[in-house]
Structures are given as structure tokens and as C-alpha cells.
From Swiss-Prot:
This is Small ribosomal subunit protein uS7. The keyword RNA-binding applies. Pfam families: Ribosomal_S7. GO terms for cellular component: small ribosomal subunit. The lineage of its organism: Bacteria, Pseudomonadati, Pseudomonadota, Alphaproteobacteria, Candidatus Pelagibacterales.
Length: 156
């Protein structure tokens, strides 16, 4: 056991334009080599495209897309008596948000569009309409948890 005090969690400064705490997390996960200005430009261009295409408030579309990607259950490996079981467990809200952002960025990077802002926009729009690779990833995780429901009593 560590004798050190537990560090307080860092507070995420909200986005200056939309006053959201999710957008800076998306920007940080897109960022390569510390080039935050480039990542911000990519995200804000994607949000502008959302605004022009949907004619709705872009932050609402963004939040709805993230909520459509967030998983509610996942599987964790648990070793019991020499056998490893995939045990379904509920996902905490912070982890669900982190997974949603990670899956969104991964799915966006795999798309064939030319610019990253187009990739992010298309993936967000697909997630808003409950389709796309990131939503498929969520469905796969849920399906995996559903198929391993028999091992739920191994939960710790």
C-alpha cells in the first residue's frame, strides 16, 4: 500500500466557445506531437460542418453522438481456477466517456476521407444517426457482454 496522499483529479477547463468539458478531451485525443492548435482547428471545423448540415445546435448534436457511442457494459477478464472468463461489468460514466471519445477518434482515423475534419464530422454525424464504426464498436462490446452474461456471478 502506498503511503502517499491520493492526488486530486485534474479539473478539465471547459471549452471557451461551447462551454463543454467533452470537446477539450476530444481535442486532446486527436492531438499529435503537442500540436493542440491543429487539433482545435480540426474539431472546430467538424463542428461547423455539423452546424451547416443539421441546422441544429451543434453542441447538442455532438453530445447526442457521444451518448450514442458510450457503452453501458463491457467485459473484463477474470481468472478463476485456471480458466479465464470474460465477466460483464457496468462501465462508470467517466470511463464510458473516455471509451466513446477513443472509439470516435479511432473510427475517424480509419475513414477514407481526405481531411481529418471531414473524417471527424462524418463519424460524428453517423454516430448521431446511430450508425458508423464507433457505434458498431459499442454494439459489439454490448453483444460480447450479453453473450457472457452467464459469468456475471464472477463479478468482483
Amino acid at each position: 500500500m502506498s503511503r502517499k496522499k491520493t492526488q486530486p483529479k485534474k479539473v478539465v477547463t471547459p471549452d471557451p466557445i461551447f462551454n463543454s468539458t467533452i470537446i477539450p478531451k476530444l481535442i486532446n485525443s486527436i492531438m499529435y506531437d503537442g500540436k493542440k492548435v491543429v487539433a482545435e482547428k480540426i474539431v472546430y471545423e467538424a463542428i461547423e460542418k455539423i452546424k451547416s448540415k443539421t441546422k441544429e445546435e451543434p453542441i447538442n448534436v455532438f453530445n447526442e453522438a457521444i451518448n450514442n457511442i458510450k457503452p453501458t457494459v463491457e467485459v473484463r477478464s477474470r481468472r478463476v481456477g485456471g480458466a479465464t472468463y470474460q465477466v460483464p461489468v457496468e462501465v462508470k460514466t467517466k470511463r464510458a466517456q473516455a471509451l466513446a471519445i477513443r472509439w470516435l477518434v479511432d473510427a475517424s482515423r480509419k475513414r477514407k476521407d481526405k481531411h481529418m475534419s471531414d473524417k471527424i464530422f462524418n463519424e460524428l454525424y453517423d454516430a448521431y444517426e446511430k450508425k458508423g464504426s464507433a457505434v458498431k464498436k459499442r454494439e459489439d462490446v454490448h453483444k460480447m457482454a450479453e453473450s457472457n452474461k452467464a459469468f456475471a456471478h464472477f463479478r468482483w
